[in-house]
Amino acid sequence: MYVRIVSLAFIAGLLALLPSSAQNAPSGMMGSPGKSASHAAPHSTDPWWKHAVIYEIYPRSFQDSNRDGVGDLNGITRRLDYLRDLGVDAIWIAPIYPSPQVDFGYDISDYQNIDPQYGTLADFDRLVAQAKKRNIRVLMDAVMNHTSDKHPWFIESESSKTNPKRNWYVWRDGRAPGEPPNNWLSLFGHSAWQFSPRTGQYYYHYFYIQQPDLNWRNPQVEAAMFQMLRFWLDRGVAGFRLDAITALLEDPQLRDEPVLGGTNAQGDPNLNEIYTNDLPGNHDIIRRMRAMIDTYPGDRLLVGETYVAHTAQLDPWYGGARHDELQLPMDTLVGLDKRLDAGRFRRLLSEAQTELHGGQPLLVFDNHDQIRSWDRYGDGVHNAAIARIIAALLLTSRDAALLYQGEEIGQITATPSRVEDVRDPIGITGWPKEKGRDGERTPMQWDGSAQAGFSANPHTWLPVTANYPTVNVATESADPQSLLNWYKRLIALRRSSAALRDGRTVMLDASNPHVLTYARTAPGGETVLVSLNMSAERQTIPLGLAAAGLHGTQLRTLLASPAPVTAAAADRRVTLEPFAAWVASVN
């Protein structure tokens, strides 16, 4: 589903308190190098997903193994060792089903096979088996709101009003000759109704014309889609990321949406989607889906694409206090913004702890639909330091964490400068107000060789970003101070620390609007302090651990950027350099 969000020289006077090993760390970053981490959290009986680091793979752009310029399944298998060494628990693979590729795989013509450009079912089975050997689980992208108009179901449905598949889609008469049934709009522009001359009726499509919506009020549709999920569960997938899950049902009375005023990128009026999005009946479907996947062993997972306006609106997607729907709705409020605002982060992280009946958020800063966080949060000067702050926030918060390929090396958004170069249909129809999503989907930058090591074909499906000779996995792997090694250290610390795995969050001094400081404290007493200076100025803050009811008198630096960083008495004032990130244990 497409929703674009636009919307250390450190404590120098106390340096002598640092252990000598920390003082000798490379300048720019502290902490031991990122080794391959065990994927089993020590002494934890929680389901695997509760503290997971999930890595989104956009398969067209990850790794090409057959020289056609498009990434594929065997390319993913080739890079599993990299993902293991990074420390991820699971990979979510964007759609790889047979598809006409109008929306690059989100228009599916066969739910139980693999698109030939990505490989075969045998390639997929090999990927799952090889990932399992590395303690990496595989999640599929389940696109359940709609199919391709080339799917056999829709071809049958469109053929006749009396066809048995007719009611598998949403068909209606126009409200007048030549007029659609109501004012509903497609997310990608213009009317959400398409006239079919074969039967003289309109079909509903929330997305592209070529993506007709399934009629989830028909029990046969639910049965067929649940069977599709079983097909992949039986092949060993660990669960699903559910695309556009808030849009499964529409108002059966077809009432017009309220008009808000103004126009969107396509020139259509802005509507309040109260009749096409987030209808209560969606939750009944998800509850039945959860009951079905719970019959499988191994803590199978449902992740939901859940864009909401307020944190409390995520709670129903867990099933409220019952926790019988999604295990991990995506919390996009924290990360899919562009304001590096400590007060805003403090409020949203606090809400996630108090308003979700104990539900575990899945924090998201990057995905295949959003301008990369490097560009959204960066100021053009301090982007590298800000990227470390974002990583620390993502990986030390009380959450499951979602990474998007390339985020860990600082890939940038490479938006086309000419409409002639755009591949994404939303960029073609919305140009220049909306330039599409090509910029965040450019090929993964593996090394400094031609095409960044992504493909041996000089004509890749999207151009490789020009900075690949210096921004790539190979270069950053060899640099202890790189963003990639910062991510590895954070993930390893997250896995080894009971406080970061299981601890509650205690927000500390809020008097400085530029600094976010919080403690994670585990039931057994371990406490980890996180302090992030979100400004270009040096900031001095009181830590205030005792005032927050936390015990401990000494701090020991675990990770810091920039370095060196000192330990300090827990209630002293601390000076943070511009855009500093500091993680410390409280003893």
Regions of interest found by a model, annotated:
Residues 49-50, 253, 257-278, 284-299, ...:
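Loop/helix patches that line or flank the sugar-binding groove of alpha-linked glycan CAZymes
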